[in-house]
């Protein structure tokens, strides 16, 4: 239960936030006095004759002024007022519940190591957003939680640079984003120190995993690979081979013994053996179904979710393309064709996971797009439904959490836009035919590529000329 100081003369006097609030609600459905309560996944607005439940995932923004609380939702605006001091309490409680839902969508686990409040600015592909936000540091990520749909999860394995400058904390991601935090006060140094500690632990975890994959890897080679592909990321196989041959050989051996064994030679032929990316992680624990069965006995698991676990991806049947072998690792390959027009993404997940190759159009430079693919795979935990669901399907109520994740992960939005098709692993001949059909039907012209690669000034919105460092209209530095 959250408690707030009432501001009376006695600082020890506190009043508990009520479970149910009373206020005047105005919305497209009704306008009247309501009882207001917050459940795990939604807010309940109960009038005398009308009843409205709004899922937190439907909320676009939460805005508090001195006299009213405004919720912008997918279906319209909701205004709550006539609550006095309790309006602030409702806002705090709603904001906290909203954030917990977002963190669940991000699949964040474990306890927050640090939580603070400040302001942030994020620059993503020429777009700018920011404002006040809660900031939480976890074992493997930093989460930005504003009171709107612009939340971001920043995996530490994709962090390229972190520096304290002019009382701000500036981050640069390998996937291109630049994020700065300000108005942190004394907690700025604490955040910097905690981030450094987490990065050190990530480096140690990476080295331990490398030794497990390739016991004969040297210390120098391990240090190079750790910088190239921290735990959770993939990297260009050619670079791995040049600097750590033993580690590259270990990955190659794992692929040849995995469910990708039969498709591996053809994928190498597709790219000419050049420029493809690989990644490797330990396989997840196989007790998730058992845990969910226990939850079902306790009444804590929806039947629809259990059905999904038992029947997931039935249409992607596995036969001669993928040998049935026990999965000890998770492997993935990102393979461009020689002309860099399309990319094939091949996964080797758990032994019960159905198999298919996903094809994407390459919108710009291959290396930049490969990083975006890698970022999307990490964010979605290799969930291919996030890519193949149509916009209409994504808007269905049962896909609300997926829609929230896509909206808050630019890399997933990009992959969905560039998705060109898939080749199901039913037979080698069928698989090859599907791949070739996707390749033949997928061709981005030079003008289309230029349009995709267009960048605009984050200040005035003017189109930036290729290669320039400053906007020709307002002089803002290009990012």
Q: What is each PLM-predicted segment?
A:
Residues 1-479:
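Eukaryotic intrinsically disordered, low-complexity regulatory linkers and tails enriched in Ser/Thr/Pro
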